[in-house]
Amino acid sequence: MAMTDTEFHQLADDMFQAIETAIETAIDEQDADVDIDASGNVLQLEFVDGSKIVINKQEPLHEIWVATRFGGYHFGFVDGKWIDGRNGGEFMPFVQDSILRQSGIALSF
C-alpha cells in the first residue's frame, strides 16, 4: 500500500528530529559550530566555513532530497528505510558521512 502524505511527514519529521538532536549533542560534546535552521519542509545545516547541507521534504514524490557540497541526492522510503535512488545507500549513514566529510563533525545516531 502506498504511503499517505501524513505518514510521509511523520517519518520525515522523526528523521529531521534525530538529525537535530545528534547535532545538538555534537555542539555540546565537541564544541561543534553548526547553525540549524528548520523551516517548513527544509532542514538547513550551516557550518563554520559557510558551507551548507540542505535536507528537503518532497511531499508530491514522498522523497527526501539532500544537497551537499558534493552533489544532490534523492531518497525514497523502501522496506522501512530511506534509500538513495542512485546507489542504494541508506539515508542516516549518508548524512553522517556527509557531515563528517563537509565539516569534520562526527555525529552519533
From Swiss-Prot:
Per the record, a Pfam family?
Frataxin_Cyay
Q: Which GO terms describe its biological process?
A: iron-sulfur cluster assembly
Question: One GO CC annotation, please?
Answer: cytosol
What SMART domains does the annotation carry? Frataxin_Cyay
Q: Name one GO molecular function term.
A: ferric iron binding
UniProt keyword annotations, A-Z = Iron, Metal-binding
On the tree of life, the source organism's domain of life is Bacteria
PROSITE patterns with a match to the protein in the record? FRATAXIN_1, FRATAXIN_2
What is this protein for, i.e. what is its function?
Involved in iron-sulfur (Fe-S) cluster assembly. May act as a regulator of Fe-S biogenesis.
Q: Which family does it belong to?
A: Belongs to the frataxin family.
Q: Which HAMAP family match?
A: CyaY
Name of protein: Iron-sulfur cluster assembly protein CyaY
Q: Which organism is it from?
A: Shewanella sp. (strain ANA-3)
